[in-house]
């Protein structure tokens, strides 16, 4: 099985906003920060607005992969995203090229991210990822149909886990409601 470096199959964009060099614009743009990217591929779309002119390459697109540069433990695959939302400081956008399935690359990166961070941060107080370490990540290149099968399986398993978690939350709400109603009918406060 052959492998390729991530830099050969994807464009890697480090988002670093320098306020001292940033240009201002008259209309605000919408930004996502590190805190918006949560585990289990959850992306909170509570954007912040800024009048800083964003770099075009920081625009988030469907099928992008987002990695936190500092203390990464997971990645976020962008399945859907509203228009004109940008990634803010300390985020990395990986845009996979056409010849490789993006969910497959997301699965590989999600499995390797802790190790990449640990290797990249020897002696550092806070673990982070450097460009050279990320560019050199090897991705096994398998038949495209197998990439689709594995990538979709990975993504759907995350979606299933989110639905199971939500079902447990709803069952807890239902249980608490029933118990509270029962207590009220017995004369409790």
Language model features: what each stretch is:
Residues 6-18, 31-40, 58-75, 108-117:
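Short Ser/Thr-interspersed hydrophobic loop/turn segments at strand-loop and sheet-helix junctions
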Residues 6, 92-141, 145:
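Basic, amphipathic alpha-helical recognition segments used for DNA target recognition
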Residues 49-56:
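Short alpha-helix capping/helix-loop boundary micro-motifs
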Residues 68-108:
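A short beta-sheet element
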Residues 1-28, 35-40, 138-189:
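Non-catalytic DNA-recognition/assembly elements of restriction-modification systems
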Residues 22-29, 57-60, 77-89:
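Short, surface-exposed loop/turn microsegments at beta-strand edges and helix-strand junctions
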